[in-house]
């Protein structure tokens, strides 16, 4: 994470900021969280994330969910949409969305799931972003205004 004095943000760009689940077990996580709060309020930051839950990598699920909850809370407070990294935790993401009823948009980054899961996420109000590898059927059923394409 960049220290505020080290940052050289382009004036003609917008940004997204978040703590990726893979970095949640970093020994300096509390400092990273402080930096996240600073950057999230920057006027050029228009999205929160990539954040979420990854059952294969990162800290414990409990710790990842705690940090994810910070992102959700801040996205709501700052009125910014949320970009979510999710690996083998869609049941938890869906449950949290249903429980919290967020007013800000949620979008799953790098969605590769089957059409049935895509329909479930879309019905809950969660948008989908597709990278290089994805399920063609899931992509086709996702309305254009709720689907994104990725370059990474």
Model regions and ranges:
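Mid-domain alpha/beta scaffold segments of enzyme catalytic cores
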Residues: 1-151
